[in-house]
Amino acid sequence: MKNQWKHAFSVILSIVVLVYCAALILGREVSAAGEGKITGTVKLDGTAPHMKGIDMSKDPYCVKAHASDPAHLEQVIVGANGGLQNVVLYISDGLTGSALTEVPAAEPVFDQKNCVYTPHVLALDVNQKFKVTTSDQTAHNIHPNPNPMTGNIPWNQSQPPGAPPIEKSWKAPEFIEVKCNIHPWMHGWHVVVKGGPYATTDGSGNYTINNVPPGNYTVTAWQEVYGTQTQKVTVAAGKPGTADFTFKAK
């Protein structure tokens, strides 16, 4: 009888474990199926400002790197259809729970290539680790300048050719300007958002924010010259939300 009870208990325990695992798998599948996205286009209304060519004569290496492809300022890049590149889109209201606290595992890279920052605008999450690398055979000095009142600490670090990546993270949301003390034309941004998915527009001004749970949200669009705009967006299961933005040229 004792052995029969043991056998029965083992069978019941196995069934419970199987049911629990099946529920977890089904939950993941339902969650994945229910995850939506927000898509749209960001455009400039009006004439785009002229982006001046960059004088790199201070460093012969940089001049040679752009001998066949002259470099220009990148504050405003507009595609043929009026789409704005390098606009960061993020969810500024409506997210709850783990969506606000889970830090992405991916480590984005901010590279120094041909004496410019690539990408020009790097979007990342609070506490998300990122790497600063150099592809150049000339020394650089990366100098982000956040507002210390936010909790983000400014730093200034040299990176000679062949140096290992610099690994950092930011503690608070902020639009952080990045410069190079050696090459004054080098200029970029770190856009640090507080939790949740985000996206950066491509050369045509298009973007997609993935992994958005169904719900009502406020989406913010940030551009380094034109500032921010917001829109209310609803995402339903299996149906993406849409938010198009238009900035007025100055």
Predicted regions and their residues:
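N-terminal secretory signal peptides that target proteins for export/translocation
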Residues: 1-8
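Extracytoplasmic copper-binding redox domains, predominantly the cupredoxin/blue-copper superfamily
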Residues: 27-250
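Bacterial N-terminal signal peptides
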Residues: 11-24
